[in-house]
């Protein structure tokens, strides 16, 4: 619900001067992600570049800097600007390899494959696909990103069988995740309804008791 997210992000921005450094980073990242999921990649890029500028004043936030750079690379690739993504991506991979971050690296390798494809270096793209299969425990969103890349890559290679297989796997996982989100949303609405119903019942109960008490006072007064 991007209308709602904009309302709350705008409200959060009013508290900017009261935010701690990490809260400011989280705000900027959430704002950029909001644009990203709307596919508003230009505003998304501007927001992540703003985040990068903000982080330069906080060199102690090294992890956050490379997360930000990973986001910037992602947007450059969405905008088909491989030349801008190139140097940032390899610095990111080197950092997260050093940190042995198995949660982030699979996604960065997918970015590396995408970069090779956009540069028309299909030999390197194929080598990367073979070298970096997704490990067990990969985040579902990162699996989706890899499946999306693979179905586009094999479509470009005219390997229709593999393209169809990866497209089918992508659609099945995406539908499953969407169903999970719908269930979570439904559960959230149910909880809100039950909470509001409980509050309403409490108000009705209190109102009833107040009426009974008023009647008692009236009889006593008579």
Regions found by a protein language model. Give the residues of each.
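Hydrophobic positions within repeat-based interaction scaffolds
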Residues: 86, 123-126, 130-222
